[in-house]
């Protein structure tokens, strides 16, 4: 239905696009066909509310949690966040009964049951359930290692690898084998150890 209303367009969103020609103008907002490839632009482009869209660009977060001080763009996001403090998990999966604090977490979880993987790597075609997993995967192709150890300068592709590496410097071994009680610096080392334990038991 055409109301004659001009579509809301944001110059800041357009600047963020890698390919402005890929824009589709629909009724009240801009939709980019390749929004998964547009860094930091997916939400603004899919948001029909000019005020919320503006906050995303300016960084304004007027809704603050009284418990922890965390701030949000939208009141609905604050409402969902409060569930963490109250322990309430309002969003329940009809398939398996798992419950979640946020609707977005339930949406991601449902992809496990449906097998849906909407985020695809343009380099190799591998698909992922979450955009964050795709972003992490892309580092394999670029050889980018943005996470650097302040102690020794060693760099890593993933933040979790840096966190585990840091355990070497501080002497922490947070991964414990439930079978024998042995502690490990790396989760991968614990996994190998557990396989050996299992193999010994079945031999």
Curated annotation (Swiss-Prot):
Signal sequence extent: none
One Gene Ontology cellular component: nucleus
Alphabetical UniProt keywords: DNA-binding, Metal-binding, Nucleus, Repeat, Transcription, Transcription regulation, Zinc, Zinc-finger
TM helices/strands, residue ranges: none
Predominant localisation class: nucleus
Cell compartments where the protein resides: Nucleus
Gene Ontology biological process terms, A to Z: regulation of DNA-templated transcription
SMART domains cross-referenced by the UniProt entry: ZnF_C2H2 (SM00355)
InterPro entries xrefs: C2H2-ZF_Transcription_Reg (IPR050717), Znf_C2H2_sf (IPR036236), Znf_C2H2_type (IPR013087)
GO molecular function, a single term: DNA-binding transcription factor activity, RNA polymerase II-specific
Function: May be involved in transcriptional regulation.
Protein name: Putative zinc finger protein 876
Gene name tied to this protein: ZNF876P
